[in-house]
Amino acid sequence: MFNFLENEKYKLKEYQPLVNQINLLETSVKNYTDIELKEQFDKLRKEYFLSQNFSNDIIARSFSLTREAAFRTIGLRPFDQQLLGGLVLNSGKITEMKTGEGKTLVATLPAALNAISGRGVHIVTVNDYLAKRDSTWMGQIYDYLGLTVGLVQSQMESQERKDNYFQDITYITNSELGFDYLRDNQVKTFQEMVQRKFNYCIIDEVDAILIDEARTPLVLSIPDTIHNPKIYLDANTTAKSLIRDVDFKADEKTKNITFTDIGIDKIEYFRKIPNIYGTNAGFLFYLQNAISANIFFRKNSEYIIENNKIAIVDEFTGRVMPVRRWSNGLHEAIEAKESIDITQTSRISSSITYQNFFTLYPKLAGMTGTAKSAALELESIYNLEVVVIPTSKKFQRKDLPDKVYTNDFAKWKAIAKECFEIHKTGRPILVGTSSIEKSDFVSFLLENYKLQYNVLNARPENLKYESEIVGEAGCLNAITIATNMAGRGTDIILGGSPGFKIIRLLKILVLKVKLKEARTKKGLFLTHELYKELQKERLNYDAITQLVKFETEFGQKQIVRQKKLSTLFFYLKINYKSRFKKQKQYINQLGGLYVIGTERQDSKRIDNQLRGRAGRQGDAGSSRFFVSIEDKIFRLFGDNKFSNLFNQLNLTNEEISLESDLITKTLDNTQERVENYYYDIRKQVYDYDELITEQRKTFYLFRSKVLKTQVSGNLIIASTEDVIKKIVKSIKTPQLKFTNLTHKQENQIILEDFEQCRRIMRYALPPINLKQINASNHNVLFEFLMQEFWISYDIHKTKAFSSIGEEYYKEYERSCVLESIDHGWSTNLEKMETIRESIVWRVYAQKDPLAEYKKEGFSTFRKMDEEMKRFLVFAVFDTDFYVT
């Protein structure tokens, strides 16, 4: 521990001279008028334009100006630890700062500095709510400095996205950023692209995005030409008739399904198929998906049903992802299971992993409260060093030893009882669960104790009030049940958020309570004129919330849209300030927020995110995890240590728990095994994806060149020549395709190949019999076909020019080229995925699966070029143009 602290101090030491320099500038910066401050920032732009370098002088002045702008606009002054955090971000590293230390404000310091380059800055958050909140809140600082701020949201159209990407600083979610990148590489013209060249990116909750989400690629899909919903329904019916461990084996850890001999016999009997591995082998794929859907994917855990559609719940954030779909037919299998209309099946159009996407940025940085435990992975894969910033106040949270129970029932009973006992003291309680299903169960248990509580999970009716629920989770006697706390954004303040309480009071005063009652019951004095004016506005609660939201969350002094309401809000805030302070002190004396974890997660980082809600900014607080040996982590990765220990102690009373530092250490070791398991998976994904990354670079570069090319005719001619060469080669040597062919079969293949030529040269190629074809040698036949092609191509273009005009035809040809490229890339991705899934079996042949994958992947990519050319040629010449 001592060495770790010394190492962190050494890392921070290099930034201290700059911190001192920024502080020395503060006095002079404070004396600037608003106009002078903006002029000084403009001066930095000009200096950078000349030098193209962020010198220490420019960095210090920019940070100092941004700090002063923050204080003048939102009333917050970045302290020295926040300056350190900003400097770490600017150097392209990860800043670890505890919950409540002001990471959102920290990001403005390097963002404003890097924005002076004019090349754009992206600040990435985990959801639309945080992106909008931060862009609005922090946007006041940027606007004051003369910088423009953009916000990209999921519902925006292309032009609006483009406008926002071209601002100095853009707030956006990781998924929108990635999907826009994929879509930009499928556009038909440069004008349709919404992003510009990447420059600098700051990722909030960087470990959640670069590690937790690294296993799941971003996938753009297109509708498949084949859609057969009946097969999913049949597979679901068959799956429900099979018995686990009798008809099939299911591995919960790997999600693999394997059939027993008994199961195969039963499937063949039900399906009336003599051999399921014969021509009907494809049904097993659908059946495996159906079984997985029924046993591994649970409603209100992995997904919810929203608007009669399956909506995936993110396992790391607990949020609904309505536009996401499971791939490879799994989504359709779940729809069949839930008796929901099966949507059009899709095929991969394009994809990329976050691991490879974010490495596209020349300068990348991130911030989080829980990165140090994943420092090795972040540095080895992303070349991102983690620097821990010390807290501004002494850390006081107590992390109590875990309580381990023999079964789930005993654990949940103990959690409910613990809530009841702690609630008696008045301490606020936060109960963290891993799913909606489990949060519902905790709610049921607390109702038996007649305890009041708030629930925050993926259900839309709860998410609507997310910031209010989290903001008031620190109130006296409050109990809050929440699924995964990563990326919630709002801090839990002891005593509750003053802003949210005042909004509620405003609602009472303006909408419901008469002036006389307000004077007596609330002990407030409001002038009759002010109250009457507010009543005239006929504001509803949502309108009040909208008008004062910047005041409540961020302390802004003026609400432009409604000064009267702002005046009342400010008055209430002053009157309640001492009350909030006293309540916070009282709750601190009680012990602060008590965090209860209901199970250990796959990663210690996620557990620490939950713990981190207590003890913010020097507050008191404590945390404890309640676990059972039936929890998922022990089922999949645990050994028999705990079971043996319970047996040795002969504990007949289920309510007795094991609790000691040794047991907690054993739990930590189990969790470490889980983390290593998933790290190996992520590393494997990264290793295999390297080949796709190289292919993607080549493919996107080629596509970009085509976009820049105004005339595509030369590419079409060259492609046609290659296709004809291949056809001629096949015609003259049909045995290359198959062996042991009869003479009749050879002739049939020749005719089929020649028919391909007829499709290309329909306007010129005369009837030719087999005798003529066989009599011609390879070169003669090729030259003849090329001559016929030129004649046919001229006729084809003449008809097209007469039908749609020369310019439109050129655009048509370019569109065909791009369509063939996209089709080829999509096909290549599907083939690479098939190779990836099957290549693991090569290990049994004493071969390296990764080396074999790269070998076959190279061959597949080379074949993609041939397939693209064929697709292009037939796409162009299969179209008829009619002269009017």
UniProtKB/Swiss-Prot annotation:
Has a central role in coupling the hydrolysis of ATP to the transfer of proteins across the thylakoid membrane. Its EC number is 7.4.2.8. Signal peptide: none annotated. It is an enzyme of class 7 (translocase). Gene3D superfamilies: Helical scaffold and wing domains of SecA, P-loop containing nucleotide triphosphate hydrolases, SecA, preprotein cross-linking domain. It catalyses: ATP + H2O + cellular proteinSide 1 = ADP + phosphate + cellular proteinSide 2. InterPro entries: Helicase_ATP-bd, P-loop_NTPase, SecA, SecA_CS, SecA_DEAD, SecA_motor_DEAD, SecA_preprotein_X-link_dom, SecA_SF2_C. It is a peripheral membrane protein. CDD domains: DEXDc_SecA (cd17928), SF2_C_secA (cd18803). The gene is secA. Belongs to the SecA family. ATP binds at Q82, G100, E101, G102, K103, T104, D491. This is Protein translocase subunit SecA.
